[in-house]
Amino acid sequence: MPKQKISIGTWITIPNEQITEIIAKSPYDWIVIDLEHSTMSLDQAENLIRIIDANKKKSYVRITSDSTDQIKRMLDAGASGIIAPMIETFQQGKAIMDACFYPCLLYTSPSPRDL
């Protein structure tokens, strides 16, 4: 049986790049950017994701709602994963999970040549 490793991380609610860099240089394995309980914008969160990624740490984002746009934007920015709050039904959970993956080839956006 492989030896299990304990994973340790922390949460960020302050959109400060210098503080994030200090935390990202610490021995944490992962950092959660908390959009639900902060006034942080998506642009600020994207900057923090880049800082965390540059320090070779995992970044997770707790989004404010089950917004597909927020999920896709944070994953496109490089987040390692999403934490979704207040999931109360199977359908909500499935919609969030589906938003985390690219749609199948049958549902792609039209390319410019198709227009």
Where are these regions (language model features)?
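N-terminal amphipathic alpha-helix/helix-capping segment at the start of soluble metabolic enzymes
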Residues: 1-9
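Alpha/beta enzyme core
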Residues: 15-30, 88-90, 95-98
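Glycine-rich, positively charged N-terminal anion/phosphate-binding segment
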Residues: 15-26, 39-54
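Hydrophobic faces of well-ordered beta-strands that scaffold small-molecule active sites
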Residues: 8-10, 31-33, 59-61, 82-84
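Single conserved hydrophobic/aromatic residue that forms the stacking wall/gate
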Residues: 107-115
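Active-site-adjacent beta->alpha loops and helix N-cap segments on the catalytic face
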Residues: 38-51, 67-69, 88-103
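Glycine-rich beta-to-alpha transition loops that act as phosphate-gripper elements at the mouths
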Residues: 12-15, 62-68, 86-87
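Catalytic cores of alpha/beta
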Residues: 69-80
